[in-house]
Amino acid sequence: MSRNGLTGDSARLIASSFAFGTGWLGLSFTFPLIAERLGFSYSFIGIIGLASSLPFPVVAYIYRRAGSRLMRAGVSVPLAILLAMSVALLFGYRSYFLPIAIIASFFQAPWWISSEIALGSLQGSRNAEKYSIAWGIPNATSPAIMGVIIDLYGFKYVFLIAAAAFAISMVTTPRMKYKEETASRESPRLSYIFPLFYAGIFSGFLYFVVEPLLKANGFPYYIIGGVTATYGAVVAVGFVVLNFVPDLKIWQYGAISSLLLFPALFLAFKVTLPILVAVSAISGLGVSISMSKILAYISNTSDTKTGVFYYESTFGFGFIVGSLGEDVLYQYYGIWTIIPLFLMPLAYGTYLILREFSHTSRLPGDS
């Protein structure tokens, strides 16, 4: 079977994406927990969240004019650095955890963006779906598995698994090819893609506020992993199920997505396991709608590089607000700051509905 043949490219794409997802999603789950264990303030934990998200809009903007050589480096170099960081963590992390976490968080962004841009150029069919499923499985399972491993054996085995996963991803990466496209003169409407911002807020909030908050309140790692895995599982299942749902208008998807994210504000009043699981599941569905249906709208209204830039920038800036922004607010003003954070998607979803109804209720002769 040819290395560059149709089946070869597809199989290597699945293997590489699954391995990378296993490695990175395992590390990203542990970083806020290690920071809490080492006594870092919420502001410093939020800095790791900033390092995880800020590179996405920056790299996506650079890649709008980048050639194939730079984008291929965007796959190989992050894998080498993440492998090195995982191995370094095996030898201890107490004295140099923060710089390693920031470096690793920064360099994962080019891998995602380079891979997403390359999907349309790889041989084989339905590569986007294969890619989503390949990283979606560890997104749904890694936190739960890593939580159990940490409780039983400690963090070292998470680093060992991550190092092995990045090594596998390196040797299974398909030969990335990038088709040159004519840059689109059309841009997606910001009002339709803005719900991705709120999806980013919840994701950053879950990983960099809820995780350390639960640990500080005595929850075991396997419970924290289960809560995070619930979110990931609903997102992954939503990707599949939404393919069989009758298409709605894009504003309807935006409104539904936004309204499904606001229940997180109830965590300001009481944090119990049933509430956590319910919020993770409901909000996970909202994020899934944003990341699938709104992404499809972006793809249909722009070329690949422009679409990736809009998608990653909108979600990435939301992630910054949900992680660093809420960490700082929580540290200085307390848990009640969750309420205005998640009143925003409620207000925006309501705005989209009222705006549409105001348009449709006008008579043809109305001014």
Task: Report the location of each language-model feature.
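Transmembrane alpha-helices of Major Facilitator/SLC transporters
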Residues: 52-62, 142, 226-247
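Helix-loop boundary and gating motifs at the non-cytosolic
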Residues: 2-53, 187-227
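Structural signature of the two symmetry-related core transmembrane helices
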Residues: 72-87, 250-266
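Symmetry-related core transmembrane helices of the 12-TM Major Facilitator Superfamily/SLC fold
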Residues: 157-174, 336-355
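A late C-terminal transmembrane helix in Major Facilitator Superfamily
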Residues: 304-333
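Intracellular juxtamembrane helix-capping segments at the cytosolic ends
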Residues: 109-123, 288-302
